[in-house]
Amino acid sequence: ISVLSIVHDTMVDGPGFRTSIYCAGCPNHCPGCHNPQSWDISHGTMTSTDELMKEIMSDPFANVTFSGGDPMFQAKALPAGTRHQGAEQQEHLVLYGYLFENLVKNPEQLELLRQIDVLVDGPFVQALRDEDLFFRG
């Protein structure tokens, strides 16, 4: 999994304290994106599922957000990291740059969807930006 960064004890990427995993790679290139450095998958550091789980489980009470970039861009690698032994009690949230209707057409993305608790879908649309909306652009 190509990871840009991991932030522990954040409250910006979902409700409550979370561990946020910022995945590299996003083909959307939304105008006004707040994280354009995430677009290129090569900007991340290759991280094994075991390493990722050690980071997630270093705070077993924190929920988890997969952001980016677009975590669904690496959907094939992520399911093993979402429901690992010990992580069952954590809420797993994914921020996704496409619409749900597109996600269910891709078998790898659909498998990841089955493993998570919350999906925030849709591309960032600068004209609709509202700073009063939580966890959205």
Residues covered by each model-derived region:
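Surface-exposed, flexible loop/turn segments at secondary-structure boundaries
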Residues: 11, 100, 127
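N-terminal pre-triad scaffold of radical SAM enzymes
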Residues: 2-29
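Conserved Radical SAM active-site core
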Residues: 1, 17, 35-112
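Short secondary-structure boundary/capping segments
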Residues: 11, 56, 110, 132-135
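Classical nucleotidyltransferase
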Residues: 105, 113, 118-137
